């Protein structure tokens, strides 16, 4: 990418003010979309799901950890059962996202719990989490229907193929890598009212782009993102380390 043009301060200020107007317009549009997201209707979750964490088996309601709101990031796992024979580790793109998650205290203060969920044995998850040094609670949905019902694991013997609200025919045209026997990533949101749990929102693909903290910083600089999200390696594999 070429460097920006060098101009006089007056020309820079005029260009910056023009951009500011566009930024404010985009902010107002995003505010409206965010409000519409919050106003989405919700559906009650009636199926019993079992997860495994460090302390043993837990339910979906347990994942809230006493709070009213729950965000689950569907962390894709790379192993033979998801189309990656010979591997047993987390997805590097999902790892890039989780690298940007900091302390969770502010979320907790807003009655919101954030967890990671993967369709992998808990022993594999714990080994990879230790390697990466993350503190975000992480649960296994292995042998559970949760991933399938959230449309991030695919088995046409269980459910018709669907990802990002597209059916099999649309996926064959736009995302042929989504097929039976594979996994993908996404995020789902739940609300708890007493003992009742409701699903309010799920996003997939570019829908979780806004959660990529590194990109939010890179979008401020002239060189921009520089790499596609799939081109970022595990952070401990940079050679030499940045």
Residues of each region from the PLM?
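Non-globular targeting/processing and membrane-anchoring segments
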Residues: 1-110, 127-133, 137, 143-242
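Catalytic nucleophile loop
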Residues: 108-125
